[in-house]
Each structure stands twice: as C-alpha cells, then as structure tokens.
C-alpha cells in the first residue's frame, strides 16, 4: 500500500512540472463540464451504488443526504465549474513590485503551492469542486474521499482525468486513491511529506483532529465552529424570514448551515412567529429558550446549555433571545 502511495506522489510531482496556460486550463474544465452533462446517467447510477450501501449499513440520515446526487445537485456541480472557468487565473500575477535605491527590482508573484492532498468525507461534489479549483490554480491534487462515496468519487475523478488526457495534459494532475482501507489515510499523513506540500481535511471533527494529530505535512484546516444568524431590532421582517429559511433549510447537512438563531428581545413578539412558523412548517424542529417559547405559538423544545454548541447537520435549530448585538457577538465567541 505504501508503494502505491509513493507512486501516486511521484506522478503528482511529475505532473506539477508541466506548464499549463490559462486557455488550456479553461478548455480542460469546459470539457470536464461537458462530460458531466453527457454522463449524468452514469454518475447517478454509480451514486446509487453508494446510497444503497449507505442505507444497508444504516448510515445516519444527514450523511445519506450529503451523499445523494440528483439532477439539481449535478446542476450545482456544473454551475460551480462554470464559475471556476470564469475566475481570473490566480497564478503568475504580479502582486507587488518595488525598486531598491541600488537599482535592484523586486517582484512579489503568485505561484502554485505544489501538490495538495485532500481528505474528505461523504460529499461527492467535493471531488469535482476540489479537482477544478486545484487545477485552475496550478496545483496537482491527490484525493482521498470517504468510502461511503467511493463509486461517486471515482466516476467524477475518471471524467476529469479523461478531460485532461483529451487536452494533452498529464492526467496525473488529478489522482484519486481508490483504496478503501482506513490505513491509507494514516500513510498519507505520515509517509508522504516528500511528495505532498499541504494537506486539507474536509469533514467532521474527528477527521480534522486526526489529521492535526498525525500529519507530518503542513495542514490547512479548521476544527470546530457553529454557524449563527443574528436578527437585529432594526431588521426587515420579510428579509429576515427569507434569510433564516435559506440559511437553515437550503441544505441542512452542510457545515455552513445555520445551527443557532439569535434574535433581539425587542422584536421577538413581532418576528418570532412568522420566522419560526416558516421553519416549522418546512419540517424544522425548534429548540428555544424560555423567552422565545413564551412568544412562539408553535411546537418547540426547551433549550439546554449544551444546545448552544450543537452542530445538528439536520432539520433542527436552536433559538436564543439576546439584549443587543454585543450579547450576540459574545455568545458566538463562546
């Protein structure tokens, strides 16, 4: 297994040596986008294998929701690639330039980082997003996705490599580790420092902690954080209803979904019911403090101190009343 990883690392370093201009980068991404459109049926078929297995092994509902692909999610992946194509090429731009008194001219120029390793969990769209972003920024990437999304990740990586090959670019610019054994992650973190320049973990707390504890490679990552939405006493009601609904229910299983709503006490009587009814009517469970519960006519559960630090990743939300924006900020900073 270690030998396989070393071969992957060596191929990534070789791919990094190939210069690729902006036109070719965008052509590869454009062809990749077309391949996704053309092979939608194949992507959905492979994804079904992952979903069927997830149901069989009784994976948590929020993880299955992350895993499932459909027409809408594939359209989202396509839209993401289109946005990346439109981005200005981030490398070889002169950021700063100055001249010393002795006539020596210095330039600060953006360059690629090098080979990037990305370890992630159950979202198949991460394969496409990360591969596209790394390629646009000139960084070869080694992808290690979770076994729960194995077939979905594999088809996305194969389509990307096919697009690279079509455009005479080293297909090893994008490599997916198709080994399901957990030990491969440990080896990736501890034995690949000669080949990987930075590791990025994308997943839950346990994954990020493991990467931080084991990695001999520099890391770009985060550990914890709860997304909050604060509704001030000067807020517009209709806007607040729309923002809160979108922030919580657009996709409940992502780490960017709102988990706690903070609402100014002065507007609770007017704002509480229309905002929370919208959430409740769309299947969201309400967990609130006493002040909010007194004013909300719908069904809710009493919040405990532990609820303010919970990342539900599902259709649940905590609601707390605050006296002002300072109290809201202090609560978030806890």
Question: Whereabouts are the PLM-identified features?
Answer:
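ALDH superfamily catalytic-core signature
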Residues: 2, 122-125, 129-140, 159, ...
């Amino acid at each position: 297994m270690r030998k396989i990883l070393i071969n992957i690392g060596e191929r990534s370093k070789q791919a990094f040596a190939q210069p690729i201009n902006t036109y070719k980068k965008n052509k590869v991404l454009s062809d990749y986008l077309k391949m996704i459109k053309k092979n939608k049926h194949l992507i959905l078929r492979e994804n079904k294998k992952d979903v069927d297995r997830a149901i069989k092994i009784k994976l948590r509902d929020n993880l299955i929701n992350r895993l499932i692909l459909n027409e809408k999610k594939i359209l989202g992946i396509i839209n993401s690639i289109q946005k990346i194509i439109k981005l200005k090429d981030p490398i070889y731009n002169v950021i700063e330039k100055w001249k010393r008194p002795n006539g020596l001219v210095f330039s600060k120029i953006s360059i690629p980082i090098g080979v990037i390793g990305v370890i992630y969990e159950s979202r198949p769209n991460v394969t496409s997003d990360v591969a596209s972003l790394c390629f646009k920024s000139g960084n070869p990437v080694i992808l290690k996705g979770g076994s729960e999304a194995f077939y979905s990740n594999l088809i996305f990586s194969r389509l990307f490599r096919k697009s690279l090959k079509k455009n005479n670019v080293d297909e090893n610019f994008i490599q997916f580790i198709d080994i399901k054994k957990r030990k491969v992650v440990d080896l990736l973190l501890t034995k690949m420092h000669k080949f990987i320049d930075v590791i990025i973990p994308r997943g839950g707390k346990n994954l990020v902690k493991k990467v931080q504890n084991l990695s001999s490679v520099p890391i770009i990552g985060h550990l914890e954080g709860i997304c909050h939405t604060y509704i001030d006493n000067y807020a517009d009601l209709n806007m607040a209803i729309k923002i809160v609904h979108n922030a919580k229910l657009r996709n409940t299983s992502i780490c960017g979904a709102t988990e706690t709503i903070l609402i100014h006490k002065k507007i609770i009587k007017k704002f509480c019911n229309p905002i929370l009814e919208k959430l409740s009517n769309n299947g969201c469970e309400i967990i609130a403090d006493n002040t909010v519960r007194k004013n909300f006519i719908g069904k809710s559960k009493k919040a405990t101190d532990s609820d303010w630090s919970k990342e539900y990743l599902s259709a649940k939300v905590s609601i707390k009343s605050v006296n002002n924006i300072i109290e809201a900020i202090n609560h978030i900073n806890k």
